[in-house]
């Protein structure tokens, strides 16, 4: 009898929540606006923040009630919740100003910070802020400045660092100008890109790519010099990487376990083949082995999967002048060390165009690939039939081992589709513009 009572009690505890779940109706509130607005949410809370007609509004009850922020002055350009501290921190940037505002308590209070840009810096927009994953006081500010170069407007950025969250100092490039009229640019990021980073280094360790470019009277590139350097003291001193002394560094990206650098040997030819270099310790780099020559790698599309492999989308933008057939656009995945890459057999369609990939951190082992066809008519002699290229989107849930189409789940409206959605091998969701 006692056992029966226990079983009944357990069943009641399990059954009542199920009934409540079936009866659950989400509460929806409506907020009217005469203007377009941006809306962000703080992680793990009911707090929302929105920018509406140059006013920042805060809600602590999931949008039911809103209160305007009065501390912020100036023409607001952008509102961003800190992606590394999404529970409580947000930034508001001011248009054409080195000033921005920050909150560390979900919008309850705000403080203003100003970047001490040089007198010659005429901001074309606002300064962007990079944050540290563990120490909120560490910030990097990148400020794009317009300069007049013999009647031509050029952009030359200034980079600043703070280790106390208040006062910024300029990061002087370790790559010095060879000519006074060369245009200098800098790109700096923290070596630790996430709270669980495997790359060694202190909180003040940053990696910077410095570039100098010169142009002739016809505005053609006449000189190009780059340097990748590591600083362990917040940009006060640097150590360059000798592996890249005779190369042009195109881009770099810092992941959880790897740092990826793309280089070119020909400093005057943007179409020259690229090399990919990998570092696991921010001290030395090794050249990765690729299955073929690579010409088009965009660092923003590179990811690291849940088992530490690097995923690189390779896009083909131009056909080969000697062969009118399109060169392949591929997805390459490395071994665990990131040094050997192999192509992924994810689709059988001819590839000529762009590939985007996403590897959402909240879906372990998941990769989404999307192919966008593109055509280079300058080299097309009629041998390549553009009709065979089409958009294609596939998903893998086992770190790229197998791929499948995205099934359309909409039984109520199945008749409104031009194909049979119960057969995803022939009728699937093609979404070339996704964001995860």
Curated annotation (Swiss-Prot):
UniProt keyword Plastid, yes or no: no
Domain of life: Eukaryota
Cellular localisation: Membrane
BNR repeats: 57-68, 101-112, 229-240, 394-405
Glycosylation sites noted in the Swiss-Prot or TrEMBL record: 157
Annotated membrane topology: Single-pass membrane protein
Protein name per Swiss-Prot or TrEMBL: Uncharacterized membrane glycoprotein YNR066C
The organism of origin for this protein: Saccharomyces cerevisiae (strain ATCC 204508 / S288c)
């Amino acid at each position: 009898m006692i056992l029966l009572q226990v079983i009944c009690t357990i069943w009641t505890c399990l059954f009542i929540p199920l009934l409540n779940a079936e009866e659950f109706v989400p509460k929806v509130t409506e907020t009217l606006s005469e203007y377009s607005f941006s809306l962000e949410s703080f992680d793990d809370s009911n707090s929302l923040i929105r920018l509406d007609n140059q006013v920042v509004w805060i809600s602590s009850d999931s949008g039911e009630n809103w209160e305007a922020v009065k501390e912020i002055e100036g023409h607001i350009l952008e509102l961003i919740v800190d992606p590394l501290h999404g529970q409580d921190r947000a930034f508001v940037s001011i248009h054409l100003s080195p000033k921005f505002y920050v909150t560390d308590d979900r919008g309850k209070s705000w403080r203003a910070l100003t970047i001490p840009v040089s007198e010659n810096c005429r901001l074309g927009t606002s300064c962007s802020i990079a944050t540290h994953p563990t120490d909120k006081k560490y910030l990097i500010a990148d400020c794009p400045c317009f300069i007049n170069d013999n009647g031509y407007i050029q952009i030359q950025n200034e980079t600043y660092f703070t280790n106390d969250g208040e006062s910024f100092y300029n990061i002087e490039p370790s790559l010095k100008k060879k000519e006074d009229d060369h245009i200098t640019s800098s790109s700096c990021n923290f070596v630790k890109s996430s709270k669980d980073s495997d790359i060694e280094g202190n909180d003040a360790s940053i990696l910077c790519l410095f570039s100098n470019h010169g142009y002739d009277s016809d505005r053609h590139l006449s000189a190009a010099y780059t340097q990748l350097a590591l600083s362990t003291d917040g940009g006060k001193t640097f150590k360059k990487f000798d592996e890249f002394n005779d190369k042009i560094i195109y881009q770099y990206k810092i992941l959880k376990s790897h740092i990826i650098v793309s280089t070119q040997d020909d400093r005057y030819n943007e179409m020259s083949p690229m090399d990919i270099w990998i570092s696991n310790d921010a001290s030395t780099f090794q050249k990765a082995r690729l299955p073929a020559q690579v010409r088009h790698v965009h660092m923003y599309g590179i990811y690291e999967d849940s088992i530490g492999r690097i995923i690189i989308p390779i896009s083909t933008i131009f056909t080969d002048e000697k062969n009118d057939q399109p060169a392949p656009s591929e997805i390459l995945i490395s071994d665990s060390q990131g040094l050997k890459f192999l192509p992924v057999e994810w689709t059988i369609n001819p590839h000529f165009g762009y590939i985007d990939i996403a590897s959402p951190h909240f879906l372990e082992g998941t990769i989404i690939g999307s192919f966008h066809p593109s055509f280079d008519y300058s080299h097309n002699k009629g041998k390549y039939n553009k009709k065979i290229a089409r958009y294609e989107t596939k998903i893998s849930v086992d770190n790229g081992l197998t791929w499948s189409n995205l099934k359309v789940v909409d039984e109520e409206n199945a008749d409104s589709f031009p194909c049979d959605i119960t057969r995803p091998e022939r009728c699937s969701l093609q979404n070339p513009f996704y964001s995860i």
